[in-house]
């Protein structure tokens, strides 16, 4: 028949039902909907529809119970498989079978005198034809089951008698039935008053029946009836109303009767005690608590119950023994218990039991069975009694045994056997309810928990009582008592109960565990039949629980376990720790939780253990590994909690194990490279334990750290404790003080010395030895090695590593003096080594794919590790060693890593730890066997491989970028040597800086994934790796590092290592302490986590900052020179970092990714404390002007970008030269170069954005480079070559940084600590944002006007300033408080504030280019937060936010595309941030520049100019362009928002945790965005990072991004506005221009000239033209700036913009954005300001709202609007349509929608955006891939041209390619990737491909690996970069799609994503993970890698993904 429901959906629903049932939950509609939507992205309405249809089809079974509907699989209904024969044994599959008759026939047929066995009965019945026909072959198993049930029921009803295994008919049943009742009471001895009853007064009786209100004259039946009156209250009732039998009435009248209200227990005589547990005797109606009964009862007895006082004494031991035997039997086979004892007695006692009085509403607990059942009941009861099975206490009892015995047995049976209730047939059970409502009430309760409530006295006092009572009555003899006690003991022993049940009703009250018998502290939810037992027996190895010792003994014979079912990850002496995965060993973990609950009062987790890892501590002996305790932690914890639950068994308490576990949890956190914190809130005990631990750890850390200055970040890094906990502990220790506007850590030497003295006196019995840990963060994806190293360093190698690292550093040339930095460096190096080798190793496709997939699957696990400590260490090692031995690393992946380890070891013993850690992590697959033999290689290697996969991906990506890349190997090595030295120095710096950040704050839990990613990115170590580390970690790391770096940088180059730490300690400490409470923690957190991220981001930003600061100080002497040097350093850092990943990519990206607004000055300059903020902007503006003079003099914002043609050429040259030179430099002086490169990259990119245009930036960047003079030549060369490259690299680094920062911010949100940071960030950022915006507005205005004049001066100043602030947190600080920047202290303070925010932003802007991703993300996160607040202030933008949220979603993907652009935008933002004025004016141009400016002039133009010629195709292309190049700024904005929201998804979602969590949609957007938006976010962050970054991170990022997206995807309006700019810009890259307009759906960016006219547009023009990313920024700026003219500038500026607005609700948001723009910052400045502000303004309000508002409806609306126009041309529409949800999301700016994105989102510029930075950083090829990405992302991300954008992406990519000359080859590849011709609308096919891929994973498209492939090196770099960038969005998408993360992501992000994008996120997720996993590794170099980009992103952004 035709099915009504879609069979696929039905299958999904059945899967969901199975999944829900597996979770031990009821398959309700809600749960089914959630499960289906999380797995398949199907919306709720559809699921419910299909569910109903499936029910109608009969394919799903609907079960209603108590008004609740459940759904079951009819083929696998679970318990309802067979309609349970509830009616008197009559149950059978065929209703025709009457089991009673069948059984009778069987017994009669068999005629066995002794009885028949079950088997013989079954055989006999099966031989009967009618039976075999009815229950034929298929029903055989069912037949056996039904037969057993029927027999059991018959025994229960008394129709059969059971003697052992034999059953026989009960012939007396019928006759007995009748007699039973009478016998029961009449045969009982007469009642007499008990001693305590005799002298009690009797109340005056009330002569009215309380029930019927009749008198003794007439009852209900109008018959006269004597009343029974209560002796206490006088209330009376007719016996008939009380349902008393005549016998009972007689007996009651002779006694002192109490009514139900007055009833007291006759044993304990406590009236108030649990009345529910009271039983009423059916003989005397006295009450007894179940615990007070002679044998205490746990369950209400079923039949007639006679108290111990009335029970007849039966003489004869035989009977008792028989009963005891029966009891034993019953226990062995509890099933045999008669179900209704009650009923059996029922009839019998029907009269008597009528006693069940339905009195005043409270039924007598006495059970009356329904008459219908009474016959069988009584019969049953009788039989049971006879049988002893039921130990009836009724009629038969007198015959067979004395009442006491009977009671005892009865009690025992009740006590020990499963309650009859449960087993009773339903029909039979029916009565109970009535029979003893009360009894049952108590019963049920008591059965589980109450039974022993008063037991103790119950047993003892009762026994005495009873003895006394019985004795007094002389009913019982001594012999009886002996018998009783004897039997009781026997019975209790059987059950293992040795004492009376305990009064607290703990169930169970005792457990036997191993050789211990442990009294429990609390009840645990064991199944009822177990929990009601007084004692449970647990297997101490598998933790199974059993009812008796016998069963336990039998189990022990069979149980082969002798240790927990997991990998042993730690062993020292006789102590081991096992890592048990709740998803793998579910039963074990559930049993462990049940056991733990016995000793924990607040534990709530028992059955849902899948998301947790359990670290089980064991003490080992010959027998096995005995459980001592455990702690659990979430695999993917948003808050970075490292302990969820912790428990030590009582017998091991007070022996140091608790501290051991806490210490161990922090060791793991450190290995993950993130600070950890126990899950809040803590229990009182937990608080005590943790406070003691924190105190001791901090005091010991302070004791060992004698630095003058120590910051909380450093403490956090050293200890792994999150900054918030450190702060609270320091506060507790009274070691925090507020002095001169800063918090200072006071060393209380006496306290420290006292503690150490105590410690020496009482050594710890058990201590964690990090050397013994063999573990790679499998699940939590953290920077494993780094933190581990830190910890190990903390643990003792600290000093050695420091010394050795110092050695290294000295060797390195930077010669950092801070061992911590060295340690960090080593960490970084190790990570780098680890990662680099891993990258190399992973280069093998098999490994790659393996790792890629595992990484995908284990994003949290593997990826973070990469990012985690391991990753970081490796990275550092790699940076050091990698820089040194880049070649070696590349060539000898693992061996290199190991060698590097060796190097590290040489450098420091920590290196040994690192080596082990690195080995474990880097070589985890290898070392697995060695280092972690206990951990199954599979898992270890999986994580490591995943980690490596990410590394590999990034390395492959990085390979292009880094010498390690294919092409660059030689260069790399040359550079590697240089990088090695420089790397060491930078590594030192990097590590130093990160170290201090790491030190200060423990590894950031926030985005360990990022870190890991970063390490993976280590090939372009400084650029991308760091970016990525920065991306996730940088937010915090950069914040913290920036803080740390700020001071150190301020100190001097030579002091760089230490000063950084020192300032960090001192100033940062103070700052940190301030920030600590809010921002600082996260920062510190970031610090720690970011070691590498920081290294990357901060190394680029901070390190450069350090170098900058040193250089800045030197730079103060030589402003520009030091600054540029820092840029060089940045670049070197970048190269170091980027060496692995960003190096190549960064150069490419640099060109393309130089945001216009961003000065290309090194971050050092930016960071220069002496610089004035205004100067920064002016410089940038001037530079921009100079640069843009060519294209748009008015738009000085473009300073960063050279004339497109120039830039293209330069980019090409510089890219390649820079790539090589960079690599050389990177390798030669990886540290310095990487730093310089990163600095240069970011600064250069920033400075270059102005400088690029005028070449002044290059000169300037080169100027600073002299400081790194050996690099300077390179830098100069690089500057010319690298300028584009640097622009890209810087952009990329900026992106990374922004991403890092955003991610860190995200991390912050994720972490509570981070959240604090974020809050502070948000607060501060908003403060600073406004300041910045104001600055920007003014400067922006000035900037545009002053651009030409001031740009140079400003650029110098700005470069310095920018370098200073930007490099550290000064960037943000710079803008917000230039003064702060100028003043080291103030700067740091400001940085602290700004650090988070502005560091994010400024880092994004300036150093972001190198680590633009992280930075931008961070910046965006911060900015988003800041601007979110702004947005909140500006309600106008809330709608925009929603739109943006949608756009963000779009742009998540766009983000991937736009990532590079994002860099540019970041650069722009950085510029903005760097110099408020400069930033603003420069922003549009910068933003444009972002995409095209340095690295991608042509591309920029191309990007920007995509729209005019593209037509519909053009639109997508242009959108793509915009998305990519043009969108660089918008894209960046997009990305920024998305990064924040999406790229930040990790960060954003977490950073935006407040927002994201507030808005599922936001998270969605974050998730989706993250999917593609992570990059976008990062990119966006760089663009949006300005102001968008902060709030964009969450909202603003979204807004900006969305604006960009809107402008790009949804609202061409931005692009329209931008279009003029685009056209202008397009002028350089013609293709781009053509492609771009349609993309933008804005008029082509001809308005470049209008820049001044349209403030928003001029910048947009510049942005659009120079950098397609500006479209969004343009849009935003246009909207923001134009909004001043037309508030809805996006809408008004071009109709197209408005249509996009209409298309996407986002545009409305953008309207708000224009409002933000209204905060007009004149000219470009206004644009940027608005841009920044928009993020803030939008950020706050809109982020949450956009997410929420945008959700599916809006997104779909947007998508549809946009999708239709553009998708159609390519059949994107279909593709989009197919991914309707995705598309919808895409449309709305659902960059998050990976599926959508690949198709529609692609046009958005996510990938595109990414490409610019990537391209800029890497090569044009890189850019091309990025553009490809953009294409993909653009298609996906940009709603209005989304579909077209698929086409456009090609163009965009091509544009990007155009922008960077080398890109063309990549372009070809890209286009090939997309199946398009490189230049023109090759993208057309691309969109389709994208469309196809979209379903797959836009990541592929997003990460145009083909471009990477094309230019192996460049592409790789780009891939790495792109991957990296893409990875962030993709990572989030990966995060969602990540197999491992898929679940988690799906948990809330995905669902949110779903909410936001329909099922896009889901589609994307599944698709992305696979494509990611496969593609990513499959084509590290190609778009497969791009798809893998998601994975690479995962790998690179693994941490994000993890997030």
From Swiss-Prot:
The GO molecular function terms of this record are:
chromatin binding; DNA binding; histone H3K14 acetyltransferase activity; histone H3K9 acetyltransferase activity; histone H4K5 acetyltransferase activity; zinc ion binding
Q: Which residues form the active site?
A: 679
The biased composition feature labelled Basic and acidic residues covers: 799-841, 876-890, 904-917, 1204-1229, 1317-1334, 1352-1361, 1393-1414
Compositionally biased residues, Polar residues? 445-458, 1136-1147, 1502-1523, 1550-1568
Chain residue ranges for the region called Required for nuclear localization = 52-166
Provide the residue span(s) of the region labelled Required for activation of RUNX1-1.
Answer: 1-144
| Residues the record lists as Phosphothreonine modifications | 369
Which Gene Ontology CC terms are recorded? Answer: MOZ/MORF histone acetyltransferase complex; nucleolus; nucleosome; nucleus; PML body
Q: Where in the cell is it found?
A: Nucleus; Nucleus, Nucleolus; Nucleus, Nucleoplasm; Nucleus, PML body
Membrane-spanning residues: none
**What is the catalytic activity of this protein?**
L-lysyl-[protein] + acetyl-CoA = N(6)-acetyl-L-lysyl-[protein] + CoA + H(+)
Q: Where is this region: Interaction with PML?
A: 144-663, 1511-1740
* Region called Required for activation of RUNX1-2, residue ranges: 1912-1947
Q: Where is this cross-link: Glycyl lysine isopeptide (Lys-Gly) (interchain with G-Cter in SUMO2)?
A: 836, 1336
Keyword line: Acetylation, Activator, Acyltransferase, Chromatin regulator, Isopeptide bond, Metal-binding, Nucleus, Phosphoprotein, Repeat, Repressor, Transcription, Transcription regulation, Transferase, Ubl conjugation, Zinc, Zinc-finger
What the entry lists under PANTHER family is as follows: HISTONE ACETYLTRANSFERASE (PTHR10615), HISTONE ACETYLTRANSFERASE KAT6A (PTHR10615:SF26)
Quaternary structure and interacting proteins, as annotated: Component of the MOZ/MORF complex composed at least of ING5, KAT6A, KAT6B, MEAF6 and one of BRPF1, BRD1/BRPF2 and BRPF3. Interacts with RUNX2. Interacts with RUNX1; phosphorylation of RUNX1 enhances the interaction. Interacts with p53/TP53. Interacts with PML and this interaction positively regulates its acetylation activity towards p53/TP53.
Relate the protein's function as given in its record: Histone acetyltransferase that acetylates lysine residues in histone H3 and histone H4 (in vitro). Component of the MOZ/MORF complex which has a histone H3 acetyltransferase activity. May act as a transcriptional coactivator for RUNX1 and RUNX2. Acetylates p53/TP53 at 'Lys-120' and 'Lys-382' and controls its transcriptional activity via association with PML.
Domain writeup = The N-terminus is involved in transcriptional activation while the C-terminus is involved in transcriptional repression.
Q: What is this protein called?
A: Histone acetyltransferase KAT6A
Output the lineage of the source organism. Eukaryota, Metazoa, Chordata, Craniata, Vertebrata
